[in-house]
């Protein structure tokens, strides 16, 4: 894998099955070695941020957003133990509500598990695109720290009818810029629902200072070297 990346760095294509290869004479061997070492170190020693959440310890990979900004990737997908634990702890401090709503996609397992543990028969999902089965749609725009361009969220008008006059709890895995929250709030308000509260597993960056957000743990932002931003 490392050798393949080295060849790709110098503009070569690596063909599986080939037993030999050669580098052009104009490529400096010393530079090739340096690049090879850098690739190896990057693959073997990926920066991580170790944290405890809902009584569980997890190592979050630190990922590049811009040249000066890195974030820790919190992925709840596939982690059943973490999903169950986070849902349990959020429900302990949740305000009174009638329904939960979340945005596609990372908030889905959390909302589902919170609904299951609380005995709710239904929760609402704001989709990234309109679906054929929708009777109609409400929409709002969103741009998060991890999305390169503006996205839209869509709510089925059939769900909107059920939300009217009800207390709606907005739930997500991580809140950072708050753009996702604003988009969900717009959908709830448009449907005539009453915002009961806003909850997340983690509050990232400036979101940690929000007084209207209930969360389990703080998630810092990072410098390129993996240190926490001051």
Question: Locations of the language-model features?
Answer:
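Short, positively charged and aromatic/hydrophobic N-terminal segments
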Residues: 22, 26-29, 33-38, 42-43
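Active-site-facing substrate-recognition patch
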Residues: 43-97
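Aromatic (phenylalanine/tyrosine) cluster motif
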Residues: 9-15, 21, 40, 45
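PRPP-dependent phosphoribosyltransferase catalytic core
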Residues: 44-50, 182-230
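Short glycine-rich phosphate-binding loop at a beta-alpha junction
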Residues: 97-104
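Short Gly/Thr/Asp-enriched flexible loops that form oxyanion-binding sites at enzyme active sites
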Residues: 110-118, 185
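Short, glycine/charge-rich flexible loops or terminal/linker lids adjacent to PRPP-binding catalytic cores
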Residues: 121-167
């Amino acid at each position: 894998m490392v050798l393949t990346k080295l060849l790709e760095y110098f503009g070569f294509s690596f063909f599986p099955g080939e037993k030999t290869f050669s580098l052009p004479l104009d490529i400096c061997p010393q530079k090739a070695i340096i690049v090879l070492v850098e690739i190896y170190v990057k693959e073997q020693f990926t920066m991580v941020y170790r944290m405890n959440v809902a009584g569980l310890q997890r190592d979050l990979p630190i990922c590049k957003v811009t040249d000066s900004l890195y974030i820790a990737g919190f992925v709840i997908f596939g982690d059943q133990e973490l999903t169950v634990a986070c849902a349990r702890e959020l429900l302990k401090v949740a305000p009174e509500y009638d329904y939960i709503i979340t945005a596609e996609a990372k908030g889905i397992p959390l909302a589902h598990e919170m609904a299951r543990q609380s005995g709710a028969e239904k929760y609402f999902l704001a989709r990234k695109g309109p679906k054929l089965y929708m009777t109609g749609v409400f929409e709002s725009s969103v741009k998060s720290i991890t999305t390169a361009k503006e996205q839209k969220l869509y709510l089925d008008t059939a769900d909107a009818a059920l939300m009217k006059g009800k207390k709606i709890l907005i739930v997500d895995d991580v809140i950072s810029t708050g753009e996702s929250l604003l988009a969900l709030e717009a959908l709830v308000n448009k449907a005539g629902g009453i915002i009961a509260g806003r909850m997340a597993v983690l509050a990232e960056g400036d979101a940690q200072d929000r007084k209207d957000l209930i969360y389990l743990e703080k998630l810092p932002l990072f410098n390129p070297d993996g240190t926490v931003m001051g």
